[in-house]
């Protein structure tokens, strides 16, 4: 029987550090439940000491998840570890993940600590975490640029202190696959007590090598991979969970281990995360991109028709791609609606939330002849973007005529008040945004405006993503409607609501 490769998902922690990808507590719980449904072994829910909001989100995930291990990140200081322990106590399999920097540049310039002092601090942190759980993970931050002799010393010491998982991060995505795999092999060979711990890796994608480095590490003895859905994460992102899992599954002739992931849930999970964060999946993205199983070349099409394995190394249905079939219509009832949401891996928090989305579904069905699974994902994501709206669109009139200056008029609810404004612009969307700004005066900088059609057809639901920046804070707004101008207004207001309710966070780089 093959060894098990532990899949450690950090979408809720490291993935959230993608600029604009902040999530509400309810959104984190929805994603965590889907990760559990997919069979993820460990869910890193966040950094409890970062803020009250992060603490409450980790606590909510720990309470919502029972089969997967829920993990909280903490620096190697007692106060952080205490917050993690408190937030995670509802999860029977809780894990505390503590870290400290070990590269010369970090120890000298950031920590301003000697190597011996760093080892002492790491030992103390692991022992302190063991008061809460035996399931303790330790990471030497920036291991890729750390001296090998020092790494061996500190890892041997934390194993003796009780750490059962050793995570080796390539924090800045600097190493090459052979180099990183060799590092894992060397550590396992040189550390006397290495057999008492599981070696894990956490690779960043700055050079586009996160998945390659992770797989190289697996071939050299790593038995846990830290990854994110769609490769979300700081800067260029992390190793993509779907790529790691399917590489190991597809090449069982090559890898000495396997995962317990239900791969048929991959596409649904990808769409859920994309919808909540507002980060669309690129069409040519491996496994979950819209073109991942498309063949346009005549030669390729002919080969696939004759024998699928000529050009397909895995089946689309194995990762959750199915026929884009007609699903529901305006005569469909609430039970059928609920049943299909459940089949798509979507579980809503309450009957009230179901009723709200069902009403929106009925409105969409009146406008759109065919309702597809993608439409349902968009409706749920649009509704769940933010729990309390400080700004709400009440009405919108946009006018665009050839040879005339586009014009928009909006009415927005701000708290208990209603305000109206109108503006001209270079186009109907620009005019709408300018009218909104006359009311909100957010002074935010528009960094991104993106429109995606959810399904085919001129009556397709349009999905708009807006990215705003204000005083260093970056947020993504999301809106969906058959009217692109209305979807744009919703997305802009959604982003402004996030700016209004944003919380300051500390983002550790592991």
From Swiss-Prot:
The reaction(s) this protein catalyses: 3-methyl-2-oxobutanoate + acetyl-CoA + H2O = (2S)-2-isopropylmalate + CoA + H(+)
UniProt keywords, alphabetically: Amino-acid biosynthesis, Branched-chain amino acid biosynthesis, Cytoplasm, Leucine biosynthesis, Manganese, Metal-binding, Transferase
EC number: 2.3.3.13
Pathway note: Amino-acid biosynthesis; L-leucine biosynthesis; L-leucine from 3-methyl-2-oxobutanoate: step 1/4
Domain Pyruvate carboxyltransferase: 5-267
UniProt-annotated stretches for the region Regulatory domain: 392-510
Cofactor: Mn(2+)
GO biological process, one term: L-leucine biosynthetic process
Entry's localization field: Cytoplasm
Binding-site list for Mn(2+): 14, 202, 204, 238
Any Gene Ontology CC annotation: cytosol
Classification via SUPFAM superfamilies: 2-isopropylmalate synthase LeuA, allosteric (dimerisation) domain (SSF110921), Aldolase (SSF51569)
Top EC category: transferase
GO MF entries: 2-isopropylmalate synthase activity; acetyl-CoA C-acetyltransferase activity; manganese ion binding
Complex and partners: Homodimer.
Function (record text): Catalyzes the condensation of the acetyl group of acetyl-CoA with 3-methyl-2-oxobutanoate (2-ketoisovalerate) to form 3-carboxy-3-hydroxy-4-methylpentanoate (2-isopropylmalate).
Similarity comment: Belongs to the alpha-IPM synthase/homocitrate synthase family. LeuA type 1 subfamily.
Protein name, per record: 2-isopropylmalate synthase
Species, as recorded: Nitrosomonas eutropha (strain DSM 101675 / C91 / Nm57)
């Amino acid at each position: 029987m093959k060894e098990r490769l532990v899949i450690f998902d950090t979408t809720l922690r490291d993935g959230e550090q993608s600029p604009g990808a902040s999530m509400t507590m309810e959104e984190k719980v929805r994603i965590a439940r889907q990760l559990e449904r997919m069979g993820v072994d460990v869910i890193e829910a966040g950094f409890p000491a970062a803020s009250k909001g992060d603490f409450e989100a980790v606590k909510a995930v720990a309470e919502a998840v029972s089969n997967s291990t829920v993990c909280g990140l903490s620096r190697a200081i007692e106060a952080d570890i205490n917050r993690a322990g408190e937030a995670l106590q509802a999860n029977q399999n809780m894990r505390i993940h503590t870290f400290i920097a070990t590269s010369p540049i970090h120890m000298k310039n950031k920590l301003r600590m000697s190597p011996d002092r760093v080892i002492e601090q790491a030992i103390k942190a692991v022992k302190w975490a063991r008061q809460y759980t035996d399931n303790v993970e330790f990471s030497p931050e920036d291991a890729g640029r750390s001296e090998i002799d020092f790494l061996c010393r500190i890892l041997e010491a934390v194993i003796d202190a009780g750490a059962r998982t050793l995570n080796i991060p390539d924090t800045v995505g600097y190493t090459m696959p052979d180099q990183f795999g060799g590092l894992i092999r060397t550590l396992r060979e040189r550390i006397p007590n290495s057999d008492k711990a599981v070696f894990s890796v956490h690779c960043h994608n700055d050079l586009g090598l996160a998945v390659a480095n992770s797989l190289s590490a697996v071939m050299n003895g790593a038995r846990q991979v830290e990854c994110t859905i769609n490769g979300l994460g700081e800067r260029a992102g992390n190793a993509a969970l779907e790529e790691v899992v399917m590489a190991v599954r597809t090449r069982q002739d090559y890898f000495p281990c396997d995962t317990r992931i239900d791969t048929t849930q991959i596409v649904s999970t990808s769409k859920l995360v994309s919808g909540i964060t507002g980060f669309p999946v690129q069409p040519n993205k491996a496994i979950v991109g819209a073109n991942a199983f498309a063949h346009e070349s005549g030669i390729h099409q002919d080969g696939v028709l004759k024998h699928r394995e000529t050009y397909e190394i895995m089946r689309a249905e194995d990762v959750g791609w199915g026929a884009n079939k007609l699903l529901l219509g305006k005569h469909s009832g609430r039970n059928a609606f609920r049943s299909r949401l459940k089949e798509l891996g979507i579980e809503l928090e309450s009957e009230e939330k179901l009723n709200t989305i069902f009403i929106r579904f009925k409105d969409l069905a009146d406008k759109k002849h065919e309702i597809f699974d993608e439409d349902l994902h968009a409706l749920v994501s649009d509704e769940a973007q933010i729990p309390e709206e400080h700004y709400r669109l009440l009405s919108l009139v946009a006018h665009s005529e050839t040879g005339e200056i586009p014009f928009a008029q909006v009415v927005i609810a701000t708290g208990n008040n209603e305000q109206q404004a109108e503006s001209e612009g270079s186009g109907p969307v620009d005019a709408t945004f300018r009218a909104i700004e006359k009311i909100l005066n957010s002074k935010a900088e528009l960094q991104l405006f993106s429109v995606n059609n959810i399904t085919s057809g001129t009556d397709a639901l349009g999905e708009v993503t807006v990215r705003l920046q204000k005083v260093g804070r970056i947020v993504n707004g999301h809106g969906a409607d058959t009217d692109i101008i209305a979807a744009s207004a919703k997305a802009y207001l959604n982003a402004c609501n996030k700016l209004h309710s944003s919380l300051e966070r500390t983002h550790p780089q592991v």
